[in-house]
Amino acid sequence: MIRQLNYWSRKAYLIYPFQVFVGALLSIVVSSETLNHQKETCALLKSSNIFNVIFAYKANQLWPFLFFSLAFLQIYFHYLARMDILPLPISSTETSSSYLTYTNHWPLLKNRIISIMITQYACKFVLKYLLLFLNFQFIDHVFIWTGGECSSGSKTTSAEKCRLENGKWDGGFDISGHFCFLVSISMILWMELHLFSRFVQAEDMFWVVNKWVRACLAIVCAVLVIWICILWVTAIYYHTILEKVLGCLMGFICPVFIYHILPKIGILHNYLYL
C-alpha cells in the first residue's frame, strides 16, 4: 500500500489539469443543449446533489480531520525513527558515560522533534486558510467587477454568502471556485501522503504500518477519490473553459507555496523542518 501511495501521490498533480482538458474537449465536441439536458435530468449532476453538499460545500469541516490525521502519523513515525539515533551502551565499561549521555540527550531530541513538527503543521494549517481566503477574495471580486451579482438581491460580494442565502451567481466572469478549492485541499493531502510514504520507505518502517494506519490512509484516499469525481462533474458540465483553467491554476497556488516555496525560506527552515 505504501509503495502504491508513493507512486500515485507523485502523479496526483496531473489529475486535475487532465480533468480540465477532458472537460474542455467535451464542451467542444458535445452540444451545450445535450450537456444542459443531462445536467437538468440527472440528480447527481446538479450542484445540490448529496455528494457535492457533504464533500464539497462542507469540505472545510472535513479537511482538518484528514489533515491532522496525516500530521499525527508524520509526527509519530518521525518520533519512532529517531528513537535509535543515540545508541545505547553495549558494554559495561561504557555504561556509566554512554548511558548518561543517552539519558541526557534523548529527552531534548524527543522534545525538539515534536515541537518542530507541531509548529510545521500549525504553519501549514494557517497558510492553507490564509491563501485560500486570498484566492476567494480575488475570485469573488473579479466576478463582481465583471458585472456579476447574487440573485438573492443582497448585494453580497461573497459566493459562499450568496449560496447560504439560497441565491446564485448571475452574470460576470466566474472563475471556478470548485476547482480552486478542491484542487488546493486535495493537493495538500496528496503532498502529505507523498511525504509520509516516502519517509516510511526511506526509513524502512513498513513494520509500523498496522491496520489502523492503513485504515487512516484508506479514508483519506477515499475522500480524495470522491473529490476527483465531483470535479469531473464540474469539468464537464459547469463553467467556461477559461474559468476552469484559471480555477485549476489558482488551486495550485496554496500547495506550491506550502511545499515548494516555504521550505526554501532559510530564516524559517530551522524552526519548521528537521
Curated annotation (Swiss-Prot):
InterPro entries: FIT, YFT2
Subcellular location: Endoplasmic reticulum membrane; Vacuole
Pfam families, alphabetized: FIT (PF10261)
Active site: H178, H239
Principal location class: endoplasmic reticulum
Catalytic activity: an acyl-CoA + H2O = an acyl-4'-phosphopantetheine + adenosine 3',5'-bisphosphate + 2 H(+); (9Z)-octadecenoyl-CoA + H2O = S-(9Z-octadecenoyl)-4'-phosphopantetheine + adenosine 3',5'-bisphosphate + 2 H(+); (5Z,8Z,11Z,14Z)-eicosatetraenoyl-CoA + H2O = S-(5Z,8Z,11Z,14Z-eicosatetraenoyl)-4'-phosphopantetheine + adenosine 3',5'-bisphosphate + 2 H(+); hexadecanoyl-CoA + H2O = S-hexadecanoyl-4'-phosphopantetheine + adenosine 3',5'-bisphosphate + 2 H(+)
Keyword Transmembrane helix recorded: yes
EC number(s) reported in the record: 3.6.1.-
Stretches in topological domain Lumenal: 33-60, 146-170, 237-247
EC main group: hydrolase
UniProt keyword list: Endoplasmic reticulum, Hydrolase, Lipid biosynthesis, Lipid metabolism, Membrane, Phospholipid biosynthesis, Phospholipid metabolism, Transmembrane, Transmembrane helix, Vacuole
Any one of the GO CC terms: vacuole
Effect upon mutating E243A: Inositol auxotrophy. Impaired ER morphology and aberrant lipid droplet (LD) budding
Molecular function as annotated in GO: coenzyme A diphosphatase activity; hydrolase activity, acting on acid anhydrides, in phosphorus-containing anhydrides
Membrane disposition: Multi-pass membrane protein
Bilayer-crossing regions: 12-32, 61-81, 125-145, 171-191, 216-236, 248-268
Keyword Transport belongs to the record: no
Ranges per topology, Cytoplasmic: 1-11, 82-124, 192-215, 269-274
Gene Ontology process terms (BP): fatty-acyl-CoA catabolic process; lipid droplet formation; lipid droplet organization; lipid storage; phospholipid biosynthetic process
PANTHER family recorded: ACYL-COENZYME A DIPHOSPHATASE FITM2
Family membership: Belongs to the FIT family. Yeast FIT2A/YFT2 subfamily.
Free-text function comment from the UniProt entry: Fatty acyl-coenzyme A (CoA) diphosphatase that hydrolyzes fatty acyl-CoA to yield acyl-4'-phosphopantetheine and adenosine 3',5'-bisphosphate. Preferentially hydrolyzes unsaturated long-chain acyl-CoA substrates in the endoplasmic reticulum (ER) lumen. This catalytic activity is required for maintaining ER structure and for lipid droplets (LDs) biogenesis, which are lipid storage organelles involved in maintaining lipid and energy homeostasis. May directly bind to diacylglycerol (DAGs) and triacylglycerol, which is also important for LD biogenesis.
Protein name: Acyl-coenzyme A diphosphatase YFT2
Organism: Saccharomyces cerevisiae (strain ATCC 204508 / S288c)
